[in-house]
Regions:
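PLP-dependent amino-acid enzyme catalytic core
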Residues: 1-196, 200
Length: 201
């Protein structure tokens, strides 16, 4: 399962092996995490300040530097949270012009994880997935559920069985399938990894 993209590919942090654009998060050979390796020369001529400023008021204005296929930006306006001047903190640390990004107002679920999920689900659509899943203790679950519902993708969320209901209320509101697993987050995450299909299957 692959799609062509000249701007980036996945590369293993440890062994250096490259995997093109596949739905992988870890190297199948050495199990090290994968990172996105960009061909900056491929975007240098087309990615300008003017083009950024003319783009939509969300993360998709930076699409040329996001690991998503061209033309696959969802219409959900994620990101573009405000910068707030932090005068008091700036005075304490000697920075007169200090601004802090306020991600407490990130659309749609008030979490910085909305940006990551938007990019992940854009790729899920490009690969043709009809169901996405994650392990979570709250914010990631809500973001995956909300954005999957918007895109018409099924979502299956694995959480620790003793997680407080308030943390995943929105997950249920958005219609995700919730699976409670006995154990802590690490155990839940391992369950997700073991049950996820391999792209080589």
């Amino acid at each position: 399962m692959n799609y062509s993209c000249s701007r980036y590919e996945l590369k293993c942090n440890e062994c250096g092996k490259r995997f093109g654009n596949q739905p992988l998060s870890a190297c199948p050979d050495c199990l090290a995490p994968l990172e996105v390796a960009y061909d900056l020369e491929a975007v240098r001529g087309t990615f300008t300040r003017e083009k950024i400023e003319a783009g939509p008021a969300n993360i998709w204005r930076y699409a040329a530097l996001l690991p998503i296929p061209e033309g696959r930006q969802p219409d959900l306006p994620v990101g573009f949270t405000p910068l707030v001047r932090a005068k008091n903190l700036g005075r304490r640390i000697g920075a007169n012009n200090l601004y802090i990004k306020n991600d407490a107002v990130c659309f749609p679920t008030l979490s910085f994880k909305d940006r990551v999920v938007a990019v992940a689900l854009a790729n899920a659509q490009a690969f043709g997935f009809e169901t996405v899943g994650c392990s979570s203790t709250g914010n990631l679950a809500n973001s995956v559920a909300a954005q999957a519902a918007r895109l018409g993708i099924r979502a299956c969320i694995l959480v620790p069985a003793d997680l407080e209901p308030a943390k995943i209320l929105n997950t249920l509101v958005y219609g995700a399938k919730l699976v409670r697993i006995d154990g802590n987050y690490d155990h839940v995450n391992r369950c997700l990894l073991y049950t996820s299909p391999s792209p080589r299957d």
